Amino acid sequence: MKIIGGPFSKVPIKNKDGLFEINDKNLYFVGSGRIALYIILVSILQEHTVSSVLWLPAYYCDVGWHIASQLGYIVKYYSVIFKDGNYTIDLANASEGDVVLFLNFYGFSQKKIQDEIRKNKKKGCIIIEDITQSLLSNNKSDFADYYFASIRKWTGVFTGGVIYAKGISKFLNQDVNLELVNHNKSFFEDYQNYLITGEGDRKYYSSCFYEAELMINSNYAKLAMYQPDVELVGKWDVKLVISKRIQNAECLIRNIKNKDILMFNEVKKGDVPFFLPVYLEDRDSVCKLLDSQGIYCSVLWERPTGCQVECNLYDNEFGLVCDERYSIDDMKRITDIINEIVN
């Protein structure tokens, strides 16, 4: 049985029209999204007069706290509440000179978040925009001082993150984490076959990816992206990826009967879904049933260290896969199961 969901292990290739202008002087490829954030936070401390306060969204990965704390930042969280198709955030206490990190969740347009970016930029805050989930969307702000993303979350490179900002080059090096590269090389091909056939040990591949994450977390000294990965990204068939993700997300939206569980009920112009987010009171039982059918949903994050502010997503939100690896029939396989168990 074909597996739906899970990390990527292959890059769809076209000979031209990749996502990035490789020679853009403000574009820097690095080893991962985490390394990108690390470099940005280091550069801010050295290049700006700041308060050393970093505001993170209450719905975010724990890695952000760990990186910032190690660098001496005082990490504070701002509330993130999802209601009636919008994320509402509270940054009333952010002050001039503070550093604020934003992201557009799941690649869907969020006017309120864009308004907050503009407002806090005018307030005198330094703005970082994590564009990982909106990497292919046309809904990023024009007001951030720094942009970064994980490429690894979108396609099957061994290494891959990107920074878009001025003056970052002095903080980079050319050292590649070859331990990570060789580790991923050792199992990516077999994992790709597992996704197609369902034949293999899921626990083994999960442990391989977990080990890869530990390799990234334990080594921020080797900053560079593996050059063959840079070349692959230059040939990445982005048009195919965008088209398939939109098509698949629209199929999910159209065929899920209970529209109340959908956090977004349309794909707007310029949106390219990272996943299709769903909100359910009994999320864990639904995910467990989907998992038993070879459909692995994405629960993005657990509540990060020290986060006590309000957020209504950690226990109830999950993402349905809609990427280019899957067909309309695969999407209907997902919705058929959901429609059976969700009233």
Regions found by a protein language model. Name each.
Residues M1-E21:
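S-adenosyl-L-methionine
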Residues K14-D17, D24-Y28, G33, Y60, ...:
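PLP-dependent aminotransferase class I/II
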Residues L19-N23, W65-Q70, A92-S95, D115-K119, ...:
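Short loop/helix-cap segments at secondary-structure boundaries that form the rim of catalytic
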Residues L41-A94:
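Conserved PLP-anchoring active-site segment centered on the Schiff-base-forming lysine
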Residues V63-H66, S109-K111, L135-N138, T155-T159, ...:
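Short catalytic/ligand-binding loop motif for oxyanion handling, primarily in non-cytosolic enzymes
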Residues I81-F171:
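Active-site phosphate-binding strand-loop segment of PLP-dependent enzymes
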